[in-house]
Amino acid sequence: MLTKERKKSLIDSFIYALESSPVILFVDFSGMSVLESNDFRLELYKNFGKDVVFTVYRTSLLKTAVKLANKELEDFEKFFEGSTGVIYAEESDPVDVLKAVKKFSESHNNKPFIKGGVLEGKIFDAAKAEEYAKLPSKQELYATVVRSLNSPISGLVNALSGNLRKVVYVINAIKEKK
């Protein structure tokens, strides 16, 4: 049985996550063994360190936290059915977190199943979670932008060096004739 202090601590941690985390995922972990659950936690730790947390809350505590955070309980109740685990991140890229959870889920018979969550303050369902998991991460987008910015510069360098090579060939040809 949880003490009042422990309940308050859990409620406060979830309220903090609701207010500050860029991504919160609600997952159904029913049917997962303790070993699979530990493997899942370990996988999150390997990918994100201590930044991503997977916690299981009592439904009553989640509902209380949502009310205390001045959020609409109706928006969240669909996530609180069944065995609900909560995953939240402090600074990690939300898309990377979604991809990691989806990848683990696909390799473990769709367990845990993403019910939905909150991304940058917007609530989304399982279908949107699938779409978000297909998006490129921030790092992939940065790489694409850098490549596209680098392409014209590379082309200019190649064009200029090509002209210099032609000048060198012409000078060498003149030198050989003399």
UniProtKB/Swiss-Prot annotation:
Keywords: Ribonucleoprotein, Ribosomal protein, RNA-binding, rRNA-binding
Name of one Pfam family that matches: Ribosomal_L10
GO molecular function: large ribosomal subunit rRNA binding; structural constituent of ribosome
Parts of the chain that traverse the membrane: none
GO biological-process terms attached to the record: translation
Domain of life of the source: Bacteria
GO cellular component: large ribosomal subunit
Purpose: Forms part of the ribosomal stalk, playing a central role in the interaction of the ribosome with GTP-bound translation factors.
Record text on subunit structure and interactions: Part of the ribosomal stalk of the 50S ribosomal subunit. The N-terminus interacts with L11 and the large rRNA to form the base of the stalk. The C-terminus forms an elongated spine to which L12 dimers bind in a sequential fashion forming a multimeric L10(L12)X complex.
PANTHER family named in the record: 39S RIBOSOMAL PROTEIN L10, MITOCHONDRIAL (PTHR11560)
Entry similarity comment: Belongs to the universal ribosomal protein uL10 family.
Name the UniProt record assigns to this protein: Large ribosomal subunit protein uL10
